[in-house]
């Protein structure tokens, strides 16, 4: 979203004339979005602990925040790609909502994966939100399964790296096109 405002009001043109690469600008935007997400997640986690939600291992807060940052880097890559390519804010928000809601609803955030129909759990297996939700839930409950955690982290690393590369490419290619 910030990229759209930067393009509209001319700040992006100033940033593009600086001696840093366009990829660095995209990475900076992604990291800024990820830090905001980490701050929001820490607030939610803090409120949850304050109202009595228990975690068997408080030292898991650090790894949980790392997972949140890893996932948000990937999802912010989608946001940066769309913001660089979108011609209007309406287009950007329409596509973000079109992608975001199904990703959320097709994850086990609201309904357990084990109780989903086979066709739906097959779709959820390709959803990075699924791996984030499962891993954070396991970490908060204290019952982390080794292979499940390794698979989740692997999927999130691949997702984040892929979105980092794609966002850098799309941002470099599209950001200075007319708005």
Located regions from the model:
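Transmembrane helix boundary and interhelical loop/hinge segments in multi-pass membrane proteins
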Residues: 1-20
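Short helix-loop-helix connector
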Residues: 16, 20, 51, 86-87, ...
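Alpha-helical transmembrane-bundle signature of multi-pass membrane transport and export proteins
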Residues: 20-21, 172
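Alpha-helical transmembrane segments and their short interhelical loops
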Residues: 22-97, 144-168
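Membrane-interfacial helix-loop-helix junctions in multi-pass membrane proteins
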Residues: 104-162
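Short cytosolic juxtamembrane segments of multi-pass membrane proteins
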Residues: 171-179
């Amino acid at each position: 979203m910030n990229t759209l405002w930067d393009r509209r009001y001319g700040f992006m043109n100033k940033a593009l004339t600086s001696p840093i690469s366009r990829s660095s600008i995209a990475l900076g935007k992604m990291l800024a979005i990820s830090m905001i997400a980490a701050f929001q997640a820490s607030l939610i986690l803090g409120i949850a602990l304050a109202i009595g939600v228990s975690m068997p291992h408080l030292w898991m807060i650090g790894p949980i925040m790392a997972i949140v940052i890893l996932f948000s880097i990937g999802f912010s890559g989608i946001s940066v790609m769309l913001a660089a390519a979108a011609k209007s804010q309406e287009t950007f928000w329409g596509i973000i909502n079109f992608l975001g809601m199904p990703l959320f609803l097709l994850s086990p955030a609201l309904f357990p994966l084990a109780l989903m129909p086979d066709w739906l759990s097959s779709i959820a297996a390709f959803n990075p939100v699924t791996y984030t939700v499962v891993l954070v839930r396991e970490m908060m409950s204290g019952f982390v399964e080794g292979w499940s955690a390794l698979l989740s982290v692997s999927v999130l690393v691949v997702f984040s790296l892929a979105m980092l590369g794609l966002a850098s490419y799309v941002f470099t290619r599209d950001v200075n096109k007319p708005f």
